[in-house]
Design a protein with these regions (language model features):
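All-alpha RGS (Regulator of G-protein Signaling) helical domain and cognate RGS-like helical scaffolds
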Residues: 1-150
Length: 150
């Protein structure tokens, strides 16, 4: 009796991973757009940090896109425009938007972590943990249920 998974189980797991990778790319695309938008509301003394987060999300997106390409999948393209869930008027609301984006990405990375192969799931967990730390750095409180909208 063989203990190897059936081809359909492997295909199903692969589809789930591809779906979550696509979701993560879409989330990082939105994060790049959002951080680019909110940079104009960040004071000069905090701009370098904000730019580093913008670049971090761009790098995360590019790594995820490469993983999809390695699987023979064309990654989702960014939208031309995104609807802001928070009206940004000043630095405080810019940090609220940044926290909202990070919270949503934490939820996506946790979903990806839950279905990934154990040898590669550390990166997803690290992305989720780093997002929670950034929320604290924005002087916001991480949500008890990461990825929740409210």
């Amino acid at each position: 009796m063989s203990t190897s998974p059936s081809p359909s189980a492997t295909t199903s797991a692969s589809k789930k991973i591809i779906d979550k990778l696509n979701l993560a790319v879409a989330g990082e695309n939105a994060a790049v757009w959002a951080f680019g938008y909110l940079l104009s509301f960040i004071p000069d003394e905090n701009k370098n940090y904000a730019f580093s987060i913008f670049n971090l999300h761009r790098n995360n997106r590019d790594k995820l896109r490469l993983r999809l390409r390695d699987l023979g999948i064309t990654p989702p393209r960014p939208k031309e425009d995104y609807e802001l869930p928070i009206v940004v008027k000043d630095m405080v609301s810019a940090y609220e938007l940044a926290s909202y984006v990070e919270n949503r990405l934490i939820g996506i990375y946790i979903q990806l972590y839950a279905i990934e192969n154990k040898s590669i799931r550390r990166e997803s967990l690290q992305c989720a943990l780093d997002g929670a730390i950034r929320i604290l750095e924005f002087k916001q409180t991480p949500m008890a249920l990461p990825g929740s909208i409210t």
